[in-house]
Structures are given as C-alpha cells and as structure tokens.
C-alpha cells in the first residue's frame, strides 16, 4: 500500500480515486494533483513507480490536508463561537446555522427525538 500524507492509499483503485482517501482531497483536487505531477489519473495505485509516488507526496504536501485541515476547521468554528455571532451561537446549541427550519426537521443536527415530559395532576 502506498502511503501519502500519513494515509494508506488503496492499491486496487485508480490514482484519482485513491487520493480521495486523504482528508481534504476530493475528486477535482485529486485530478489537479495528478495533472500537476504528470501521473495518469486512470493508472492503478499498485502500478505507480516510486518516483510517481514521490511526486504525488510533494504535490499533496503543498495543500492543507489531514490534521492541519481538521485543526483549521475546528479553530474556525471555535472563533465563531467565541465571537458570539449568530453562526457561533447555532454551533454552540447544535442547531443548523444556514437558515433551515427547525420546527419539524433538522433531526441530524438536533439528534434523536426526546420524549415529552408528562405533567403531574
């Protein structure tokens, strides 16, 4: 298995698809990386030479991926929460922050339904 940016890339997949195993690399960025390095994107990962893998490692190293990207995303959300802006408050409350309705939907963000509390008579 090839190892790029601390991630094992599956051998049986095409280079373009295999690179998407790296957090922060999608299909379009994977294709751009392949074009920049001259590595054919439809070539299987197991057929790549060591020189090809080294080129890919160098090119992926220029992009913010994996732990750095996760840390950056977390810091951005924390900054919003510290500012006390609308989006930060919604993050803090665990609600959607892009204007979706929450009266009936938003179950993914709000979590499972809670049982209603019965009043004593």
From Swiss-Prot:
<dbReference type="GO" id="GO:0003735">
    <property type="term" value="F:structural constituent of ribosome"/>
</dbReference>
<dbReference type="GO" id="GO:0006412">
    <property type="term" value="P:translation"/>
</dbReference>
<dbReference type="InterPro" id="IPR019980">
    <property type="entry name" value="Ribosomal_uS13_bac-type"/>
</dbReference>
<keyword id="KW-0699">rRNA-binding</keyword>
<feature type="region of interest" description="Disordered">
    <location>
        <begin position="91"/>
        <end position="121"/>
    </location>
</feature>
<dbReference type="InterPro" id="IPR018269">
    <property type="entry name" value="Ribosomal_uS13_CS"/>
</dbReference>
<dbReference type="GO" id="GO:0000049">
    <property type="term" value="F:tRNA binding"/>
</dbReference>
<comment type="function">
    <text>Located at the top of the head of the 30S subunit, it contacts several helices of the 16S rRNA. In the 70S ribosome it contacts the 23S rRNA (bridge B1a) and protein L5 of the 50S subunit (bridge B1b), connecting the 2 subunits; these bridges are implicated in subunit movement. Contacts the tRNAs in the A and P-sites.</text>
</comment>
<dbReference type="InterPro" id="IPR027437">
    <property type="entry name" value="Rbsml_uS13_C"/>
</dbReference>
<dbReference type="InterPro" id="IPR001892">
    <property type="entry name" value="Ribosomal_uS13"/>
</dbReference>
<comment type="similarity">
    <text>Belongs to the universal ribosomal protein uS13 family.</text>
</comment>
<dbReference type="GO" id="GO:0019843">
    <property type="term" value="F:rRNA binding"/>
</dbReference>
<dbReference type="GO" id="GO:0005829">
    <property type="term" value="C:cytosol"/>
</dbReference>
<comment type="subunit">
    <text>Part of the 30S ribosomal subunit. Forms a loose heterodimer with protein S19. Forms two bridges to the 50S subunit in the 70S ribosome.</text>
</comment>
<keyword id="KW-0694">RNA-binding</keyword>
<keyword id="KW-0687">Ribonucleoprotein</keyword>
<keyword id="KW-0689">Ribosomal protein</keyword>
<protein>
    <recommendedName>
        <fullName>Small ribosomal subunit protein uS13</fullName>
    </recommendedName>
</protein>
<keyword id="KW-0820">tRNA-binding</keyword>
<dbReference type="Pfam" id="PF00416">
    <property type="entry name" value="Ribosomal_S13"/>
</dbReference>
<dbReference type="InterPro" id="IPR010979">
    <property type="entry name" value="Ribosomal_uS13-like_H2TH"/>
</dbReference>
<dbReference type="GO" id="GO:0015935">
    <property type="term" value="C:small ribosomal subunit"/>
</dbReference>
């Amino acid at each position: 298995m090839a190892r790029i940016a601390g991630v094992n890339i599956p051998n049986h997949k095409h280079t373009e698809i295999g690179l998407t195993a790296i957090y922060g690399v999608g299909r379009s960025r994977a294709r751009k990386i392949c074009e920049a390095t001259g590595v054919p994107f439809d070539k299987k990962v197991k057929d790549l030479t060591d020189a090809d893998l080294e080129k890919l490692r160098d090119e992926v190293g220029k992009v913010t991926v994996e732990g750095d990207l996760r840390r950056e995303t977390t810091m951005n959300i924390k900054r919003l929460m510290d500012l006390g802006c609308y989006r930060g408050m919604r993050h803090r409350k665990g609600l959607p922050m892009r204007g979706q309705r929450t009266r009936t939907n938003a179950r993914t963000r709000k979590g499972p339904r809670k049982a209603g509390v019965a009043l004593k008579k």
